[in-house]
Amino acid sequence: SLWGTPRLPCSPGWQGATKRLLVRSVSGASNHQPNSNTGRYRDTVLLPQTSFPMKLLGRQQPDKELEIQQKCGFSELYSWQRERKVKTEFCLHDGPPYANGDPHVGHALNKILKDIANRFHMMSGSKVHFVPGWDCHGLPIEIKVLSELGREAQNLSAMEIREKARSFAKAAIEKQKSAFIRWGIMADWNNCYYTFDGKYEAKQLRTFYQMYDKGLVYRSYKPVFWSPSSRTALAEAELEYNPEHVSRSIYVKFPLLKPSPKLASLIDGSSPVSFLVWTTQPWTIPANEAVCYMPESKYAVVKCSKSGDLYVLAADKVETVASTLETAFETISTFSGVDLENGTCSHPLIPDKASPLLPANHVTMAKGTGLVHTAPAHGMEDYGVASQHNLPMDCLVDEDGVFTDVAGPELQNKAVLEEGTDVVIKMLQTAKNLLKEEKLVHSYPYDWRTKKPVVIRASKQWFINIADIKIAAKELLKKVKFIPGSALNGMVEMMDRRPYWCISRQRVWGVPIPVFHHKTKDEYLINSQTIEHIVKLVEQHGSDVWWTLPPEQLLPKEVLSEVGGPDALEYVPGQDILDIWFDSGTSWSHVLPGPDQRADLYLEGKDQLGGWFQSSLLTSVATRKKAPYKTVIVHGFTLGEKGEKMSKSLGNVIHPDVVVNGGQDQSKEPPYGADVLRWWVADSNVFTEVAIGPSVLNAARDDISKLRNTLRFLLGNVADFNPETDSIPVNDMYVIDQYMLHLLQDLANKITELYKQYDFGKVVRLLRTFYTRELSHFYFSIIKDRLYCEKENDPRRRSCQTALVEILDVIVRSFAPILPHLAEEVFQHIPYIKEPKSVFRTGWISTSSIWKKPGLEEAVESVCAMRDSFLGSIPGKNAAEYKVIIVIEPGLLFEIIEMLQSEETSSTSQLNELMMASESTLLAQEPRELTADVIELKGKFLINLEGGDIREESSYKVIVMPTTKEKCPRCWKYTAESSDTLCPRCAEVVSGK
């Protein structure tokens, strides 16, 4: 038959070209198609029939989505897929969003990414495990509650604060949950996890004790980040750095008290000698216990031209410091840092107090003088030096960030970051040990919630020793896949910077650290019996019991008697709660299924590299020596569409509810619906920062609008088609239809692979290219005549309908995980599915290996090259008003083109359909006589078959001339003998009706 299998001149099983066809739009020439107003033949033309709307305007989009959710069983889908008898399981563990405030676009980005992954895996045949959760405890909620209560908050008991915090968290959870459901997120909504749930808290306490029992949890007096504004210790993950913070940096003299032997030999004693120190935290000077140097570095004794005094500082810093102090230094001598050993200097505020000179590796030459002031209670490295050399670690600052009485009467009760700093600087001036003060703008840690600066102060806290855990964790991370790969290094670097993990907080809204403290001695009590008792109470009644039950019920005699313990009345429950990163970091133990308790995927924002990803890893490695995840995906943050941070002051905050349902002024903030939000997420490069704004959302809506048009064409043109009875066998289809199935299989394979790699952006780009270029601009424009003007049951028409059915199926399944509402809407309009189920209950894309015909690329691409030459020669004109003669020298190309047209001249051949002309003539040699008005176009085409084994370049000529035929009043092609008679094809179709 004319549309049969290509008769290619080589052995069966040949492989065609590996290059991809660059299909070009045919819009370069006018291509008129019949429409519903084709006069007396109107009723004989088979125009598309579908009730699927081209556009949903205004409220129609969000309303249609809600209708689809109801009609297609969105709420039952999760339980349906869990009940399937399938072998493979896919577990995505939901990192709990914080139960504080309204849903925002960051939530949308995160939840929609997870849902796309889950829906793909479910359609691909896996049983998806996805239990949403919320992080419910912690300082941000407590502070919010207290600030709303104002003065009333001062008189509240711990339990009153907890009750109000719980109510606040519950309200936020309900708001967020309803938004997530509205966005089409498929999840186990009936069994969410909450970190304030008693069963969750009990599991968390068991994990805590497992780590304690292994010697990983300990109580110690150490410097920690402390927030005076929140009156609690903070972990690194609870800090945010303010790059605009202004500190008062000072250069201070520490007078020499006792020189080391080497230094003694370099000075003559005629001038006073001081060690020069620079610090950005003047308030820590009163707590100084030592000055540190770098043993391997060179140091210098210099003479100051202004004062005549001798100073000691790093040799590399002499010029810089002299310039800063607006003086000149004359270098008297240089020596190695190690030569400072055993020397001491005077405390700059307490002359008779010695500060030893000590070697330390944390001293750098990047800033300052190469000599570092060391206050063990107020610096992590300082603490390390003090531990090594048994220095005092007295903390002079209380919970409110003010000096204690130990700091002396001049400083007592003064805030260290404000008036306290002023007084210290004045005291240094009085002591004549201040050389210079200047303002320094630098990055400084702030409390993530109160937005106020923190300090470092030593206090008794509970810590996890992560030194050993880190080694095992880093080894295990080598087996975890990170997307993008660079995220792994980021996580390891953050872990390396963390010396220990402070897990205690001095607040009440959280899980108590289950330890009892002796009333009079610095002793505490915790063992397996006390833990078992507390865990059972918490499991049944929640962690409120720690505050509501009397001590004798929390620590009953029978529990103590098991270990021969002391009287319970000597002990009281501790007042500290656990860090919320420990709360959420133990979620794997409560949520993950099966004995392995490992998730296939964790997917969160990049801030979780130092947060939840890390706390989950550390607790899991500590208790069971394995990572809780197999793959980790890290996405960026959301920004305004110009790449700026969103803020109320800039007026660029995008609220997802406004995106979905529209704002107050719907002309400015139209209702886009949830699918536009989902397309925006999928289309973004989520591995970097993600922009959102009106133009971005409009672009997403336009993409979906074009997709709807494509889908409407597909649905409308299969209205009279039943795949079971009307399909044409693939090998009997038109070449162009077979070719589209070949492209479709390639598309399906690529899209499936991209979903597996979680590269949803490439899925969108591939789909968009296919439905705009390959379908709308190319294939649809070619097949309209066959669809509209052939007989209803003509095999030529059924051939392209067979292709359209397969295209529709693949396209809908390809975008279903991204646009579930649109996918279901289309599924309801497919005419040959009488009782449509949900598209999500019918599996993933299915293609046939018989579609794979790479050799067809040579046939189609060669004709397209000729057609492009033809259309380019008649810009803006109707191609159907011209006839073409194609001249090809005998050989491979001629034989390939000949399979598209067996007659010499035809207006109905596959070749002419592709050329879109009035008629096409195929010749092996040029005609002898041509009229003067012809256009001659020359070209060459390289045939490449059998993976390059068969290569042949052929020349061709396309001769273009106006047709002598008239426009057929039915099909509008120029194939009729006169304008009032039908062309032969249409006459045959109409007479047969």
Curated annotation (Swiss-Prot):
Major localization listed first in the record, in broad terms: mitochondrion
- PROSITE patterns this protein is in? AA_TRNA_LIGASE_I (PS00178)
Q: Its Gene Ontology molecular function terms?
A: aminoacyl-tRNA deacylase activity; ATP binding; isoleucine-tRNA ligase activity; tRNA binding
Q: Which UniProt keywords apply?
A: Acetylation, Aminoacyl-tRNA synthetase, ATP-binding, Ligase, Mitochondrion, Nucleotide-binding, Protein biosynthesis, Transit peptide
Broad EC category? ligase
Q: Which GO terms describe its biological process?
A: isoleucyl-tRNA aminoacylation; mitochondrial translation
Which catalytic reaction applies to this protein? tRNA(Ile) + L-isoleucine + ATP = L-isoleucyl-tRNA(Ile) + AMP + diphosphate
GO cellular component annotations of the record: mitochondrial matrix
Instruction: Spell out the subcellular localization from the entry.
Output: Mitochondrion matrix
According to its UniProt record, the EC number is 6.1.1.5
Q: Which residues does the record give as ATP binding sites? A: 645, 648
- For the keyword Zinc, the answer is no
PTM sites of type N6-acetyllysine:
55, 170, 214, 222, 706, 756, 762
Location of motif 'KMSKS' region in this chain is 645-649
Motif 'HIGH' region is found at: 97-107
Q: What InterPro entries does the database record attribute to this sequence?
A: aa-tRNA-synth_I_CS, aa-tRNA-synth_Ia, Anticodon_Ile_BEm, Ile-tRNA-ligase, Ile-tRNA-ligase_type1, Ile-tRNA_ligase, M/V/L/I-tRNA-synth_anticd-bd, Rossmann-like_a/b/a_fold
Transit peptide residues according to the UniProt entry? 1-29
Q: Which positions bear N6-succinyllysine?
A: 55, 175, 222, 460, 481, 756, 762
What the protein does? Aminoacyl-tRNA synthetase that catalyzes the specific attachment of isoleucine to its cognate tRNA (tRNA(Ile)).
Q: Which family does it belong to?
A: Belongs to the class-I aminoacyl-tRNA synthetase family.
Protein name, UniProt field: Isoleucine--tRNA ligase, mitochondrial
Instruction: Name the species this protein comes from.
Output: Macaca fascicularis
